[in-house]
């Protein structure tokens, strides 16, 4: 099919392999072209190649390749949204890369300008998916983040969530209950297979005076106190 290729900057972009770039239109610093992909059924190992050449004082940024029929202004791939239809709630543990997260400071969080697999998906995109689908959401706050991170996270969602859009999406989906946003302190802090267990156990041992009398495991006291701290922030 024919894909849309969009990029910014004065560098050079070329396409090879199973792709052919044509009909490039320059709109100032933004460049738009069409890429025809030709894949012969039964052939394997054939790849699309996109080569970027940056000269002095020239660079290419914001390169996007859109499948046929996809609106470049859309935040999410339509088949992805369609796959979410059966569900009433979305848990974002993996999107937030919660297990084993090393995030501490808000400045180190993934942003829409810079993100990959290591620290998860930007909170702005999580909020946008909630806005678009109207589904209840379950957030998991990484274990090591400081109070400022938690406060900034709350402010971010307060600003990014559009409750008018959420309600419209819920009405369209036939949801009759109010929207709910669940916030969990990390994930499975009782599970010794995750680093959060050691994090909370160390915190509990460091502050024995906060012990509440919980006897269901060494993780219990500070997990509860950690939840209380999280809710206060």
Q: What residues fall within each predicted segment?
A:
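Non-catalytic accessory regions flanking glycosidase/transglycosidase catalytic cores in CAZymes
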Residues: 1-185, 190-233
């Amino acid at each position: 099919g024919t894909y849309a290729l969009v990029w910014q900057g004065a560098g050079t972009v070329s396409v090879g392999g199973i792709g052919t770039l044509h009909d490039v239109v320059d709109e100032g610093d933004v460049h738009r072209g069409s890429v025809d992909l030709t894949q012969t059924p039964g052939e394997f190992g054939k790849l699309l190649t996109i080569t970027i050449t940056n000269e002095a004082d020239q660079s290419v940024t914001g390169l996007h390749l859109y499948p046929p029929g996809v609106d470049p202004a859309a935040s999410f791939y339509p088949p992805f949204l369609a796959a979410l239809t059966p569900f009433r709630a979305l848990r974002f543990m993996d999107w937030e890369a919660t297990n084993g997260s090393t995030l501490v400071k808000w400045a180190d969080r993934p942003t829409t300008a810079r993100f990959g697999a290591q620290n998860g998906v930007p909170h702005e995109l999580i909020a946008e998916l909630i806005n678009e689908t109207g589904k209840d959401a379950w957030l998991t706050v990484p274990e090591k983040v400081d109070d400022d991170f938690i406060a900034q996270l709350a402010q971010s969602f307060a600003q990014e969530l559009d409750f008018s859009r959420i309600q419209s999406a819920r009405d369209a989906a036939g949801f009759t209950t109010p929207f709910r946003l669940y916030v969990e302190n990390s994930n499975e802090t009782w599970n010794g297979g995750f680093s959060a267990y050691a994090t909370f156990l160390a915190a509990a041992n460091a502050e024995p005076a906060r012990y509440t009398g919980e006897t269901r495991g060494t993780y219990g006291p500070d997990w509860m106190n950690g939840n209380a701290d999280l809710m206060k922030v």
